Regions:
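Extended effector regions of multi-domain proteins
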Residues: 176-179
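Conserved beta-strand in the GNAT
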Residues: 2-8
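Acyl-donor binding region in acyl/amide transferases
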Residues: 11-166, 173-174
């Protein structure tokens, strides 16, 4: 069906230090990230075979991660980069980031992007009340639909998979080395 790359971060830190983490090429970590690194799994790239696109294959990948976590309860945190295609219109990227910054902000400054995405512009933030997640999500979907696009699958999955407060977007940045 597909695969998700992940690595136990404490083990990787013991072997290769902080430079052994892919996310460290994208983010500088603060002290508040230490407990996450000690009990975390860094999620990397994933793929789904084309024959399974459009099915519940991503759910199966999540079930596999869940089964791993059930057998290894020492891991409490999943973290990693999630991309937004550069093929999306700039306005769509700005709206997505404004929405996710508003509703899923970092509770503590645990990581800072090495290549920060510009702060959300007031005209993008004004699209959302910040008071009603479901109404603002509906608004985001409509705005993106007008631009001919939709919320990227992993953004939807991450925010819907976890219980309230269970997902945070620590920072937003660009990865000059990442190709669409």
């Amino acid at each position: 069906v597909g695969a998700y790359r992940f690595i136990p971060t404490a083990e990787q830190l013991a072997r290769k230090g902080i430079n052994g983490l892919y996310t460290h090429t994208l983010f500088d970590y603060g002290q508040q990230m230490e407990h996450v690194l000690a009990q975390g799994l860094e999620l990397g790239r994933s793929f789904i075979q084309p024959a399974y696109w459009g099915r519940r294959s991503l759910d199966y990948l999540w079930q596999g991660i869940g089964a791993f976590l059930a057998r290894h309860p020492q891991y409490r945190y999943l973290f990693g980069p999630v991309s937004i295609s550069a093929g999306l219109p700039l306005a769509a990227r700005d709206l997505l980031i404004a929405f996710y910054r508003l509703y899923f902000p970092a509770s503590v400054p645990a990581a800072r992007s090495r290549h920060p995405y510009p702060a959300s512009l007031p005209q993008h933030l004004q699209q959302f009340s910040g008071q009603d997640y479901h109404a603002d999500l509906t608004r985001l979907k409509a705005l993106l639909d007008n631009l001919g696009c939709a919320i990227p699958t992993l953004y939807k999955q991450y925010s819907e998979l976890c219980e309230p407060g269970g997902v945070e977007f620590l920072d937003f940045g660009t990865d000059p080395a990442f190709a669409d």
